[in-house]
Curated annotation (Swiss-Prot), chain A:
Alphabetically ordered keywords of this record: Cell projection, Cilium, Cilium biogenesis/degradation, Glycoprotein, Membrane, Transmembrane, Transmembrane helix, Vacuole
Species classification: Eukaryota, Metazoa, Chordata, Craniata, Vertebrata
Summary of the function given for this chain in its UniProt record: Required for ciliogenesis.
GO biological process, one term: cilium assembly
Name of protein: Transmembrane protein 138
Organism: Bos taurus (Bovine)
UniProtKB/Swiss-Prot annotation, chain B:
Origin species: Bos taurus (Bovine)
Name listed for the protein in its UniProt record: Transmembrane protein 237
Gene for this chain: TMEM237
Bilayer topology term: Multi-pass membrane protein
Highest taxon above the source species: Eukaryota
Keyword terms, alphabetized: Cell projection, Cilium, Cilium biogenesis/degradation, Membrane, Phosphoprotein, Transmembrane, Transmembrane helix
Length: 162, 400
């Protein structure tokens, strides 16, 4: 069974990483006095996303549903989060690589092209959706029903099998 | 009873003496005057004696005690000084707090003696402090024993066994606080310990679900704030743009020059607030449950509309990132390498201003929609109280 204190700790860590992600997405364009600053911010951001992915999977592994072998049920319930997080991670890395590549020599020049602008919009939109889905999943995993056998779980399992 | 006879060691509490070493410097003078008055001194000595020498003299009558007081002056002096200190620190409070209780316990035994005896009770309670402290730890069990002792002993062994049965039934417990013993009601202590037990029992009810719910509500509060702040910011922004641009956008170069420092910070702030607001709005319609969200949108639910408007505003705002950066890097067209060629200003700025205006309108409308019913939150209902029928007990707890 998930301990309340442990869950609070994990949840706060997740929110910390999420808020860092939001912060970098918002203000990284402002903080480009030197290319290195942006580089470090981006690297930490990507690591934060990776950490969040690891944490959410560890939380999955900790559920009774997973330990009972009902991985499919978990995936079915949270596939939106899993897919979106993966997509967002890929978009982030590609945008970061592209931007850093363009700005490495001169961080204060105008580098925008239509392609970059498009990628930028998609990455930022994915960030918002990721934030929403991830937050929702993290909060939902606090539901004690995921950590014990119950009628609800059996019914869910039946639904998924059908 | 056996316990009580073992008490003698208590008569010379090691801890208090250490305390006294510190205290005498400040208070000794006060005590001496008191002890010098014959009655008081006699009484206090008597008290000391009975208390201190209790164990050896257990069977001897109290009168002997009084004789002994006079014979053994040296030791008594020392004890005398000790006792007053204790009196000052702890018993003075006790006096005020529990006048009725003390007489009850000792009165029966001591009454045969004269006046000084009346004070006796206090002394004894002092002496019993260590024991009481000990009991305080095990209040529940000891209380029962105490009552039976009191009932059996007092009348039968009235004179001789003064110390034995007396100390127990005290209503006071002495708790050491900041190196002093202070009187506290036994009943209150029991209550507090009970409370602790109760709170221990209550703790399990603060489940992970409650943590999740409180986090969710906290985020909703942030969302409510960001909705309003975003609406205000967007309106302020568009007003500033139109003011700087002059009548019918006739003064665009002025707008560029003035606004170029503001453009990028505002774009960043706008994204931050839009992201927060969008997530918060999605929360309200439980966007993840697509069917419910679409149904709500088709039913023109204000929350669903607000979510849609926020998302549209977000897309529009993001699409202007390139232009914002261009404004941010503005240099007059005369400057070499300028991004702003002659005559291009209106062509670039016109759509940018329109988009900003639309964003402001969308954001303002969303805010109106959401503030119409700020308490409504579909995801809280669906996520945290779903399957109420299956788990009526849990459902009630959550919905409350």
């Amino acid at each position: 069974m998930l301990q309340t204190s442990n869950y609070s700790l994990v949840l706060s860590l997740q929110f910390l990483l999420l808020s860092y992600d939001l912060f970098v997405n918002s203000f990284s364009e402002l903080l480009r006095m030197a290319p290195v600053i942006q580089l470090v911010l981006f690297i930490i951001q990507d690591i934060a996303i990776l950490f969040n992915i690891i944490i959410i999977f560890l939380m999955f592994f900790n559920t009774f549903v997973f330990q009972a072998g009902l991985v499919n049920l978990l995936f079915h319930k949270f596939k939106g989060t899993i897919i979106l997080t993966a997509v967002y991670f890929a978009l982030s890395i590609s945008l970061h690589v592209w931007v850093m590549n363009l700005r490495w020599k001169n961080s204060n020049c105008f580098v925008w092209t239509d392609g970059l602008q498009t990628l930028f919009v998609f990455q930022r939109l994915a960030a918002v959706l990721y934030c929403y889905f991830y937050k929702r999943t993290a909060v939902r995993l606090g539901d004690p029903r995921f950590y014990q056998d119950s009628l609800w779980l059996r019914m869910e399992f039946m639904q998924v099998r059908r | 009873m056996g316990k009580k006879q073992v008490r003698p060691p208590r008569a010379l509490p090691p801890v208090p003496s250490a305390i006294q070493d510190d205290i005498p410097l400040s208070r000794p003078k006060k005590k001496k005057p008191r002890t010098k008055t014959p009655l008081a001194s006699a009484s206090s000595e008597g008290l000391v004696q009975t208390a201190v020498h209790r164990p050896p003299e257990g069977s001897e009558p109290p009168t002997k005690d009084s004789i002994e007081h006079q014979e053994a002056p040296v030791q008594r002096r020392q004890k005398k000084t000790r006792l007053p200190l204790e009196l000052e620190t702890t018993l003075t409070q006790k006096k005020t707090a529990s006048p009725s209780l003390l007489p009850n316990e000792n009165g029966i035994n001591v009454e045969p003696d004269e006046e000084p005896v009346i004070q006796k009770p206090r002394r004894k309670t002092k002496k019993t402090q260590p024991a009481e402290l000990h009991y305080a730890n095990e209040l529940g069990v000891e209380d029962e024993d105490i009552i039976t002792d009191e009932q059996s002993s007092p009348e039968q062994q009235s004179v001789f066994t003064a110390p034995t049965g007396i100390s127990q039934p005290v209503g006071k417990v002495f708790v050491e606080k900041s190196r002093r013993f202070q009187a506290a009601d036994r009943a209150e202590l029991i209550k507090t310990t009970e409370k602790i037990d109760v709170s221990m029992d209550m703790k399990p009810s603060w489940t992970t679900r409650d943590v999740a719910l409180s986090v969710h509500r906290a985020f909703r509060m942030i969302g409510v704030f960001s909705h309003g702040f975003l609406a205000g910011c967007a309106v302020w922004n568009i007003v500033v743009i139109y003011v700087l641009a002059g009548d019918e956008l006739s003064d665009l170069s002025n707008l560029l020059q003035q606004y170029k420092t503001l453009a990028y910070p505002f774009q960043s702030l706008l994204y931050l607030l839009l992201a927060l607001s969008t997530v918060s709005a999605f929360d309200r319609i439980d966007f993840a449950k697509t069917s419910v969200a679409i149904r709500n949108f088709l039913a023109l639910d204000p929350r669903a509309l607000a979510s849609f408007l926020y998302f549209t505003a977000l897309v529009l705002s993001l699409s202007q990132q390139m232009t914002s950066d261009r404004i941010h890097l503005y240099t007059p067209s005369s400057v070499n390498g300028s991004l702003w060629a002659e005559g291009i200003e209106e062509q670039v700025l016109q759509p940018w201003i329109v988009v900003n205006l639309v964003v402001a309108v969308l954001v303002g409308l969303s805010w109106l929609f959401l503030s119409y019913r700020p308490g409504m939150d579909l995801s809280e209902e669906l996520m945290f109280s779903s399957d109420v029928e299956e788990y009526p007990d849990k459902g009630i707890k959550v919905s409350s």
